[in-house]
């Protein structure tokens, strides 16, 4: 009996910048896949899904899938990521907003 595994290469890093993760309190409202941009909620101060309203407001990228029951979120706080690998909000279609979403942080979009 042979066990067959399927390997799918997933390399979201787009450059040689070191990628570091951190943990922070979150308040997701639904199941959220890894590689989703995050921002700080202005009222609670917790991490939530970036709304895409303003470039420079995103603070991190969700590192592992999480949901509304996840009190603490693992997220990338630094690194370079390919623009096509980040799960952008559907309302954000302007590439300039995507590339500058993390302005002022240690995250680069390439």
UniProtKB/Swiss-Prot annotation:
Gene3D superfamilies per UniProt: Head decoration protein D (2.40.300.10)
Region described as Disordered: spans on this chain: 1-27
A Pfam entry, by short name: HDPD
InterPro entries (UniProt xref): Head_decoration_D, Head_decoration_D_sf
Protein's cellular compartments: Virion
GO cellular component: viral capsid, decoration
Keywords: Capsid decoration protein, Capsid protein, Late protein, Virion
Signal peptide: none
UniProt superkingdom: Viruses
Keyword Membrane tagged: no
Functional summary from the UniProt entry: Putative decoration protein.
Full protein name: Putative decoration protein
